[in-house]
C-alpha cells in the first residue's frame, strides 16, 4: 500500500525541513509497526539468498547506514523488505552533531547534502535499542556501523573504534568501520596507508579476541569514500586483503559538487549523495574489485535509484547493494524493484 501512497505523500514531506521530514517519517513508520500495520504498508519480497562474509542474506538489497543512527526504528524499516539493515553511525559517547540546518535536498538532481556529524545517543543507548528490536531477535541481518567522537583527537581514533566494537560485537551480524564521512574533521585521514594499517591491525586483533570470548565470529567491513584516486584505491585494497578484512562498503558520500553546480544548496558544506554520486561510487567498486577480486566482498552503495542501477553495481563487482537517498526520492517501491532486478 505504501508503494502506491508514497508518490502522493512525498510533496508534503518535501515541503518540510529535510531533517524534520526524516524524523516524521520514521516515527510514523514505527507507530504503524506497533499498531500491527506493517503487513499493510510493507513489501513482501521473495527470498533470493546470498552468502557474503559468511552471513546468509535473505536478499541482496540492504538499507545503508545513516537513516537510523540510533537503531531506534529497525522494526519499522524492516517492513520495506530489506535483506539487511545497517544502523548507525554510533560513537562511544552521545554527541549532538553539527548545528542545524544540516540536511538539504537538491530535487533537481535527485540528491541530498548532509553534514549531520555523527549525531547519536552513544553506544550504550544504541545497543539497548538493537537488543529491543524484533528484527534482530527473529534472525534479521543487522549491520552496526561505528565511528569516532568529534572531540576525540585523530591520533586516538583507534580507541573509539575499539570501544564501540567491543560493545556492539555481541549484537551484530556484521560491524562496519566508518572512516569516510566528510562531516567529522580529519576522519578521512584514516584512509591513509599508515593510519589504516594501524586501525585495521587493532580491530582484527580485537575481532579474534571477541570471537573467542563470545564463541561467534562477526565479520568486519570497512566503509570508504568515493573521492579516491587509483593509488588510494590500490593501497586500501591491499590493506583489506593483507589484514583479512571481511568486506568493504563502497561508497560513502562525495565532497565533489561538479554534478550539481549552480543548483540551490549546492555549495552547502557536507557530503553529497543520491543520483550524482552513482558514477563515482561505481567507478570505485569496479577499481576496488580489480584489486581485491573475490578475496574481499564489496557492498555497493551510491546513487541507486532503480533496478538497472543496482544491477550496474553488481556487474562492477559488488555482491550486495544498499540504498538510502533513492529511498527518500522513490519510496519503498525501490527496494522491491532492485530485488527483482537482482533475482536469480
UniProtKB/Swiss-Prot annotation:
GO cellular component, one term: cytoplasm
Gene Ontology terms describing biological process: 'de novo' pyrimidine nucleobase biosynthetic process; 'de novo' UMP biosynthetic process
Positions that bind FMN: 65-69, 89, 145, 178, 223, 251, 274, 303, 324-325
Subcellular location: Cell membrane
EC number assigned by the record: 1.3.5.2
InterPro entries: Aldolase_TIM (IPR013785), DHO_dehydrogenase (IPR050074), Dihydroorotate_DH_1_2 (IPR012135), Dihydroorotate_DH_2 (IPR005719), Dihydroorotate_DH_cat (IPR005720), Dihydroorotate_DH_CS (IPR001295)
Main localization (coarse): membrane
Family: Belongs to the dihydroorotate dehydrogenase family. Type 2 subfamily.
Assembly and interaction partners: Monomer.
Known function: Catalyzes the conversion of dihydroorotate to orotate with quinone as electron acceptor.
Name assigned to this protein: Dihydroorotate dehydrogenase (quinone)
Organism: Cupriavidus necator (strain ATCC 17699 / DSM 428 / KCTC 22496 / NCIMB 10442 / H16 / Stanier 337) (Ralstonia eutropha)
Amino acid at each position: 500500500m505504501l508503494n502506491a501512497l508514497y508518490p502522493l505523500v512525498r510533496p508534503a514531506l518535501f515541503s518540510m525541513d529535510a531533517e524534520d521530514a526524516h524524523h516524521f517519517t520514521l516515527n510514523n513508520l514505527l507507530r504503524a509497526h506497533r499498531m500491527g500495520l506493517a503487513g499493510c504498508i510493507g513489501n513482501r519480497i521473495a527470498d533470493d539468498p546470498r552468502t557474503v562474509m559468511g552471513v546468509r542474506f535473505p536478499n541482496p538489497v540492504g538499507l545503508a547506514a545513516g537513516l537510523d543512527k540510533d537503531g531506534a526504528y529497525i522494526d519499522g524499516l524492516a517492513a520495506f523488505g530489506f535483506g539487511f539493515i545497517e544502523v548507525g553511525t554510533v560513537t562511544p559517547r552521545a554527541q549532538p552533531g553539527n548545528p542545524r540546518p544540516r540536511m538539504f535536498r537538491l530535487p533537481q538532481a535527485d540528491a541530498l547534502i548532509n553534514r549531520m556529524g555523527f549525531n547519536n545517543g552513544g553506544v550504550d543507548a544504541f545497543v539497548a535499542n538493537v537488543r529491543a528490536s524484533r528484527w534482530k531477535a527473529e534472525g534479521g541481518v543487522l549491520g552496526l556501523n561505528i565511528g569516532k567522537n568529534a572531540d576525540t583527537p585523530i591520533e586516538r581514533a583507534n580507541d573509539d573504534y575499539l570501544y564501540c566494537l567491543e560493545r556492539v560485537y555481541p549484537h551484530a551480524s556484521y560491524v562496519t568501520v566508518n572512516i569516510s564521512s566528510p562531516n567529522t574533521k580529519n576522519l578521512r585521514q584514516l584512509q591513509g596507508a599508515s593510519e589504516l594499517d594501524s586501525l585495521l591491525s587493532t580491530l582484527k586483533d580485537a575481532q579474534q579476541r571477541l570471537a573467542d570470548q563470545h564463541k561467534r565470529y562477526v565479520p568486519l567491513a570497512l566503509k570508504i569514500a568515493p573521492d579516491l584516486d587509483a593509488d588510494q584505491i590500490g593501497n586500501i585494497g591491499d590493506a583489506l586483503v593483507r589484514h583479512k578484512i571481511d568486506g568493504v562498503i563502497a561508497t560513502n558520500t562525495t565532497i565533489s559538487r561538479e554534478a550539481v553546480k549552480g543548483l540551490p544548496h549546492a555549495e552547502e558544506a557536507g557530503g553529497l549523495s543520491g543520483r550524482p554520486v552513482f558514477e563515482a561510487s561505481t567507478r570505485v567498486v569496479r577499481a576496488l574489485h580489480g584489486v581485491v577480486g573475490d578475496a574481499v566482498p564489496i557492498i555497493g552503495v551510491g546513487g541507486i535509484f532503480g533496478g538497472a542501477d543496482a544491477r550496474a553495481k553488481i556487474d562492477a563487482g559488488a555482491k550486495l547493494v544498499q540504498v538510502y537517498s533513492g529511498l527518500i526520492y522513490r519510496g519503498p517501491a525501490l527496494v522491491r524493484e532492485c530485488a527483482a532486478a537482482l533475482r536469480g
